[in-house]
Every structure is written in structure tokens, then in C-alpha cells.
Amino acid sequence: MTTSASSHLNKGIKQVYMSLPQGEKVQAMYIWIDGTGEGLRCKTRTLDSEPKCVEELPEWNFDGSSTLQSEGSNSDMYLVPAAMFRDPFRKDPNKLVLCEVFKYNRRPAETNLRHTCKRIMDMVSNQHPWFGMEQEYTLMGTDGHPFGWPSNGFPGPQGPYYCGVGADRAYGRDIVEAHYRACLYAGVKIAGTNAEVMPAQWEFQIGPCEGISMGDHLWVARFILHRVCEDFGVIATFDPKPIPGNWNGAGCHTNFSTKAMREENGLKYIEEAIEKLSKRHQYHIRAYDPKGGLDNARRLTGFHETSNINDFSAGVANRSASIRIPRTVGQEKKGYFEDRRPSANCDPFSVTEALIRTCLLNETGDEPFQYKN
């Protein structure tokens, strides 16, 4: 695996320059999703003053032929700022700016799933949909193996690593802690973190977030993770099954509720939503990974705390079901449910939009309904 040698450079020397005053100028790093639907790209511009809201940020452009988003003969793409965060790498007053991508004709790029998701969220804003997403990922070393694994073998079997403590159980905690603090600084709604079942696999949780902000916060949290890993010389992968065999895959379990579900006797609305989901399983499978279900097919086998990709199931406290109702929700008869099907490399805009379409807009069938503007 070819990796940059940047992590070996002397960070102390860099800090000499990073501590220099920057006057009234502000560095804004524009971030966008590339043509793969998974990769992130970024570039920085100088602003004359600190923007107070995303509306104060200017549009920009980039070469879409170099990001799998256009042909070279007509390659200019537009970057339209959508969400703004504090920059944990350059620190205040500098900014991270998540952008939507538009083509030369001002139509959204194929991987700009935020655009439609925003329209769908606006249609149900009175129901106050909340989301929380549990992002699993695997740390990979420069040798192509999971971080800390033997180059020519495997660690001990799964069991002691989940929420594990100790040098023989926790692989890469420094990266996890750095990412956590960077997210807090940025204003990302990170709710927690833990070591996962497979060694070198970790999870962080984002939420609760209402509506479109779920996707904004998760994508920026992913960007921050990649940048932290860049500094450490380690790679974070969201592949849903990075290691074949008797090892857990990586998902992005999605917790969902509406105002009605969170209030007294909300379990009724939770059960109604699950019934709707049961009739639209294949539509959701296609929406839950960037390859239309092909990535998830390696993960959703019915083993390693997953359901089978071909079957829909639901149950209380059942981590082998498509949909899990937490035990406390069953006892209190209100709260939320967890959709365990999304893959680790899902687009959160696609996942949350699909849940709204099926559960709140009562769509049926294998294709999303096309609403008029």
C-alpha cells in the first residue's frame, strides 16, 4: 500500500509557522464529496474577514475532471457552501466548509445527494425527525493490514477487543482520542466513541441531529478523521467488510425518531414505521451503500451481528435483525428505533432521505417518488 511520507515530517517545525499571526485574514477549507460518492476532496481559499454564517461564504469552483465528476472538455464544477464548522487543524478563526457540488448548468452533481435530501427534509420539518448514526471504521497500517495486526498472520480471535482496555486489546486509541477532541472543537455533534469487536475497528456516534444536519455533521466528522489519520500516518477505511472471514464487518447503524415517537405511547408510531419499512426492504438496501447494495452484500450475511441482506426482520434488543427496538424503548413505549442495515461507507444523506420517504411520506415501491418543485 503506497502512502504519503508526510506523517514522518517534523511537526514541530510546522508548528513554528502555524503559530504565526494571520492578521484579519481567514482560511476557509472547502470540502466536497467526489464522484465515487465515498471520497472527500478539499481545497482552501483566503477570506478577508471571518464569516458569521454559511450564507456569507462565496461560491467557488474546481476541476471536476480530476474528481470523477465531469469530462475535461467541460470540467468546471461549482462549490456551493452548505454548512460551516470551526477548523480544528488551523484553529479559530479559520473554517471548514462542507459544500454541495453543481454542474456547469447548475444542476446537482450525481453524487450531490444532499440537494434532494434537503427538499425531502423540508417537507416533514413539522415532525422534527431526529437521527443518530453510529459510524464504524477500521484503522489500516501502511502495510495494508489493519493497524497493529501481524504482517503475516492474525491477532487472537474476537472477544476481548470490544470496548477493550490495554495495549493488547486497544489498537490505535491515540487516533480515536485526537479525532474526538477535534470534532468537539469543530462543533460536530459527536456523542461518543468506543472500540469495536474486531481489533483496530472503532466507532464514533454522531447525533442527535435534526433533518439535513445529520448528513452534514457525519460527513465533516469523516473528513476530520481522515485528516487526523493523515497526521498519524494511518489510513481509516469505511469498507463494510475490510477483512473477509470470521471478523465483524463495519456498519453505520442509524437511529431514527419523530416527535410523535418520542412522546407518550410513541411505540405505536415506531411499529407503524417498521411495518412500512418491511414492505420496502430492497429499496432501502440499494440506498444504504454507494454501490446499490453490492458492498453490503459482503457484510449482511446473517452472521457477526448482522441480518441477511435478502430478508427483513425486526425485534426488541435483537442485533441480528434489520431493525432493532432498544429494550428501554420497549419498556417505556416511546423513543426511537435503530436501522442496522446501512453500511459504514453509506452516504448519510441517502440513508436519512430513504427513511423519511418510507416512514413519513408513505412511499411504496422500488423507486423514490419524484415530487414537483
UniProtKB/Swiss-Prot annotation:
Stated induction or repression of this protein's expression: By glucocorticoids. Vitamin D and the Wnt signaling pathway inhibit its expression and activity. Glutamine synthase (GS) levels are regulated by a negative feedback mechanism where elevated glutamine levels stimulate GS ubiquitin-mediated proteasomal degradation.
Residues modified to Phosphoserine: 343
Known EC number: 6.3.1.2, 2.3.1.225
Expressing tissues: Expressed in endothelial cells.
Gene3D superfamilies with a match to the protein in the record: Glutamine synthetase, N-terminal domain (3.10.20.70), Glutamine synthetase/guanido kinase, catalytic domain (3.30.590.10)
Binding site for Mn(2+) 2: 136, 196, 203
Localisation: Cytoplasm, Cytosol; Microsome; Mitochondrion; Cell membrane
Membrane association type: Lipid-anchor
Domain (GS catalytic) ranges: 113-373
Residue list for modification Phosphotyrosine: 104
Gene Ontology terms, MF aspect: ATP binding; glutamine synthetase activity; identical protein binding; metal ion binding; protein-cysteine S-palmitoyltransferase activity
Residues the record lists as binding Mn(2+) 1: 134, 253, 338
SMART domains, alphabetized: Gln-synt_C (SM01230)
Reported cofactor(s): Mg(2+); Mn(2+)
Stretches the record annotates as Required for glutamine-induced ubiquitination by CRL4(CRBN) and proteasomal degradation: 2-25
Binding locations of ADP: 336-338
Catalytic function, reaction form: L-glutamate + NH4(+) + ATP = L-glutamine + ADP + phosphate + H(+); L-cysteinyl-[protein] + hexadecanoyl-CoA = S-hexadecanoyl-L-cysteinyl-[protein] + CoA
Domain GS beta-grasp: from-to ranges: 24-106
UniProt entry keywords in alphabetical sequence: Acetylation, Angiogenesis, ATP-binding, Cell membrane, Cytoplasm, Disease variant, Endoplasmic reticulum, Epilepsy, Intellectual disability, Ligase, Lipoprotein, Magnesium, Manganese, Membrane, Metal-binding, Microsome, Mitochondrion, Nucleotide-binding, Palmitate, Phosphoprotein, Transferase, Ubl conjugation
Known function: Glutamine synthetase that catalyzes the ATP-dependent conversion of glutamate and ammonia to glutamine. Its role depends on tissue localization: in the brain, it regulates the levels of toxic ammonia and converts neurotoxic glutamate to harmless glutamine, whereas in the liver, it is one of the enzymes responsible for the removal of ammonia.
Family: Belongs to the glutamine synthetase family.
The protein's name in its UniProt record: Glutamine synthetase
Organism in which the protein naturally occurs: Homo sapiens (Human)
